[in-house]
Swiss-Prot record:
Motif ('HIGH' region): 53-63
Organism listed in the record: Prochlorococcus marinus (strain MIT 9301)
Binding site for ATP: 625
Cited PROSITE patterns: AA_TRNA_LIGASE_I (PS00178)
Catalysed conversion reaction: tRNA(Leu) + L-leucine + ATP = L-leucyl-tRNA(Leu) + AMP + diphosphate
One of the record's GO molecular function terms: leucine-tRNA ligase activity
One Pfam family this sequence matches: Anticodon_1
Family listed: Belongs to the class-I aminoacyl-tRNA synthetase family.
Cellular compartments per GO CC: cytosol
Protein name as catalogued: Leucine--tRNA ligase
């Protein structure tokens, strides 16, 4: 509770956000205003969470948008009487910190903790309603001990394994990347390096065990953006089809298995294509063919990020089509991927666009086996026919609809053992090994006698060593640290070595939301009872770029830990909001391709490059140092205040859309808050002076106030924060126009209501003006107002008047008029008399509140 002696006198009529915001932030902290209430059950809880930040050192506007959106939602729910959990932490492990530490010659721990301290102070400037008592960083030993604990839980459940595999290697960061961390151009998600392939022994999690549930349960996520669900659906990539086994004529002991979703086209297969690394290639003896394949490998490696030519190499290998015993040549093709399916595909040129192009280029037969309707004749195709139809050239299946033939041919194959039904996923197991120091150590000991042995949970944590050399040329800093790496086997007791790989940072962020409800729990990762009370997260806010990394991994972790009986929830995040980017004007010289700093441009309305006088293109792009278009949040807060920054961020664009920074828009919000300030300063001086009261003004203000309550409440619930602020502005206009013309009770009620409605958006000024008009408790401890539906009723309505069914006029009618009064008012109107004069009115039909029809 905020006591009266904590109030401050206002010495100036000018709005001074710096003074106001510092004052209230201090008082809120002192009074533990945002400490989370204890929950007895989960009926009145609301868990609001932003994706926690990586401590890069400085807050940027993208951060501000994320945290302000979540804060608004958390504050609103607290006003609605919910017990709100709104925590904050730090995603602190990872390569950026390690690389920054190497550059500066300091430890990643020192670098990270310094950045956390600075960013926390910046976040506090925003006036967030965060419960800082629950704060943690993933690099804290008392956090990552539980990441190791959960790793062992997954190990016991059979979800962790190690294997040697070809992996994505980042040559700049010297570490392995998961498939999800390689972009569509084959580049590292972080360093931007061209990713290479390397053979290493790695640790994996069996996320594929949950592929079907992860896919199916997307249907439960009604409050997730559709595009995020589509991205996850595509990434999981479920295909229901058939594995077809082709015998190899030249090598009877061998079989070539091909996955297909189109067994109905099996009679149209005129070639099979395999990848450059397929195991069958070992059976090719012709040296010229082998050399061509080697050349193709080099071409693929060199051009992996470019559009590939459809290159084919015909081999001496011949397969046998199981449906008709016809020979099929086997080709090595540039478009076949090692990692998808079996590394081999059927070539059906007549009914696949890619196969048609490949066949035309390489002079391969094209055999049509599906026609649009039965009356069509077999003819030479100008392009692949990819629609449904009826089979031809397919023996006993001729004339059968291809959708039916698909099932029948598959059934024949299963019965005759040359096919099996198969469900296939694009999703691959999650590779979690990283060959760097600054990550969570993997709690495994490598013993020459026992192999890889998991530690007992009582032996945790495996702490990172502090005496470590992580200079730039060190590939395996942990392995080279003899004091740390040498240990004894927990199984047999002989000399052994600790695992020197660390975990992917996404391991730490895949469960952090489970820690907050019991963040101080000393002997387990979380209290089950607290998880079952607080989870799932009611509102999660973060960038769409995490759709197939963090969000998919977090869903997997939740399901896997549920199956280990650690809690009962199925999904971690009930409602997801993916905010758009914050963009600002960037000035680009299209001749040089370089960006020019605005500070170097004389006239921003007609920008030219000061070096070569070229006219610059103005682009709105994501803020970045390289484009000279970053806006420092601290400088904005210093100049205009946090409340102005918050109002701008929330008003400028709907939260899911990209937001374009504009100084004039920021100034507009500052002026709006200044007008509010001036109104309340004047009201504070005259709050007890009786006003003249005018019924019409009072009625209008009551109506405006109730409209504002209703619309702002609905807008916040629907994440339409920009329109909520528009409604707030309308209410302000009504309030300022009538404040001196209404009775004192209504004046106080309206001023009080406006304060509460403003508070989630601009919490500091709302608190200050609340106390200016005489209230002692914090405005943030108030209840959200309810609207009065009666006050929203109109005095009159528009009545449509028809004569013989045709609209002739529209008239405003008071609600209290009866039918006789309505007739008396309307029948003598000139526009109606024009159509009824000298005519017999046979009937008048009135549908009150809507329409009146005069039949003449």
């Amino acid at each position: 509770m905020i006591s009266p002696d904590q109030q401050y006198e206002t010495d100036t009529n000018l709005y001074n956000p710096s003074e106001i915001e510092k004052k209230w932030q201090s008082i809120w902290t002192e009074n533990n205003l945002y400490k989370t209430d204890e929950l007895t059950d989960n009926s009145d809880k609301f868990y609001a969470l932003s994706m926690f930040p990586y401590p890069s050192g400085n807050l940027h506007m993208g951060h501000v948008r994320n945290y302000v959106i979540t804060d608004l939602i958390a504050r609103f729910q607290r006003f609605k009487g919910k017990s709100v959990l709104h925590p904050m932490g730090w995603d602190a492990f990872g390569l950026p910190a390690e690389n920054a530490a190497i550059e500066r010659g300091i430890s990643p721990s020192v670098w990270t903790k310094k950045n956390i301290s600075h960013m926390k102070s910046q976040l506090k400037l925003l006036g967030l309603s965060v419960d800082w008592d629950r704060e943690f960083a993933t690099c804290d030993e008392n956090y990552y001990v539980w990441t190791q604990y959960l790793f062992l839980e997954l190990y016991k459940a059979g979800l962790v394994y190690q294997k040697e595999s070809e992996v994505n290697w980042d040559p700049i960061d010297n570490t392995v990347l998961a498939n999800e961390q390689v972009d569509s151009e084959g580049k590292s998600w972080r360093s931007g390096a061209i990713v290479e392939k390397k053979l290493l022994k790695q640790w994996f999690l069996r996320i594929t065990n949950y592929a079907d549930e992860l896919l199916k349960d997307l249907e439960k996520l009604d409050n997730w953006p559709e595009r995020v669900k589509i991205m996850q659906d595509n990434w999981i990539g479920k295909s229901i089809g058939t594995n077809i086994n082709f015998n190899i004529n030249t090598h009877p002991e061998k079989k070539l298995t091909v996955f297909t979703t189109r067994p109905d086209t099996l009679f149209g297969v005129t070639y099979l294509a395999i990848s450059v690394n397929h195991s069958l290639i070992k059976n090719i003896s012709d040296q010229e063919t082998i050399q061509h394949i080697e050349n193709l490998k080099k071409y693929l490696k060199k051009n992996k990020n470019n559009e590939l030519e459809k290159i084919g190499i015909k081999t001496s290998l011949i397969a046998i089509n199981p449906v008709n015993s016809e020979p099929i040549p086997i080709w090595v093709a540039s478009y076949v991927l090692d990692e998808y399916g079996t590394g081999a595909v059927m070539g059906v040129p007549a009914h696949d666009l890619r196969d048609f192009e490949f066949a035309k280029k390489n002079n391969i037969d094209i055999k049509q086996v599906i026609i649009k309707d039965k009356s069509e004749q077999n003819k030479e195709l100008d392009e692949a026919y990819v629609e449904n139809g009826y089979l031809i050239n397919s023996n006993q299946y001729d004339g059968v609809a291809n959708t039916i033939a698909k099932l029948k041919i598959s059934e024949e194959g299963v019965n005759n053992r040359w096919a099996e039904n198969k469900t296939q996923y694009r999703l691959r197991d999650w590779l979690i090994s990283r060959q760097r120091y600054w990550g969570c150590p993997i709690p495994i000991v490598n013993c020459k006698k026992c192999g890889s042995v998991p530690l007992n949970q009582s032996e945790l944590p495996v702490a990172l060593p502090k005496d470590i050399d992580i200079s730039a040329n060190k590939i395996n800093a942990l392995g080279d640290n003899k004091n740390w790496v040498n240990t004894t086997c927990p199984k047999c007791g002989i000399a052994a070595k600790k695992e020197t790989d660390t975990m992917d940072t996404f391991m730490c962020s895949s469960w952090y939301f489970l820690r907050y409800p019991s963040s101080k729990c000393p002997n387990k990762p979380f209290e089950k009872i607290e998880i079952n009370k607080w989870l799932p997260v009611d509102q999660y806010v973060g960038g769409v770029e995490h759709a197939i990394l963090h969000l998919l991994y977090a869903r997997f972790f939740t399901k896997a830990l549920r199956d280990n009986q650690l809690f009962e929830i199925d999904e971690p995040f009930k409602k997801l909001l993916t905010q758009g980017m914050v963009q600002a004007a960037a000035y680009k010289n299209n001749k040089t391709g370089k960006y020019v700093s605005p500070s170097d441009i004389n006239d921003l309305s007609n920008p030219t490059d000061p070096i070569d006088n070229t006219k610059l293109e103005i682009l709105f792009e994501k803020m970045s140092k390289s484009k000279y278009n970053g806006i420092d949040p601290e400088s904005v807060i210093k100049k205009y205040g946090a409340d102005t920054a918050r109002m701008f961020i929330l008003f400028k664009a709907p939260p899911e859309k990209d937001l374009e920074w504009g100084d004039t828009d920021v100034e507009g919000q500052f002026r709006f808050l200044s007008r509010i300030w001036k109104l309340y300063i004047n009201c504070a001086k005259n709050v007890n002076i009786k006003s003249n009261s005018y019924p019409d003004k009072e009625k209008s203000l009551i109506k405006s106030m109730n409209i504002a309550i209703k619309e702002i409440s609905n807008d916040i619930l629907n994440n339409q924060f920009n329109t909520a602020i528009s409604e707030l502005m309308k209410f302000y206009n009504s309030l300022s126009n009538s404040i001196n013309d209404v009775n004192n009770n209504l004046k106080i009620d309206a001023l009080k209501t406006f304060c509460i409605l403003l508070a989630p958006f601009a919490p500091h000024i709302a608190e200050e003006i609340w106390h200016l008009i005489g209230f002692k408790k914090s405005v943030h401890l108030e209840h959200w107002p309810s609207f009065n539906a009666e006050a929203l009723k109109e005095d009159s309505y528009e009545l449509v008047i028809q004569v013989n069914g045709k609209v002739r006029e529209k008239v405003n009618i008071n609600h209290d008029m009866n039918e006789d009064q309505i007739k008396e008012l309307t029948l003598k109107r000139p526009n109606i008399l024009k159509w009824t004069k000298d005519k017999e009115i046979r009937k008048i039909i009135i549908v009150k509140g809507k329409i009146m029809n005069i039949v003449v």
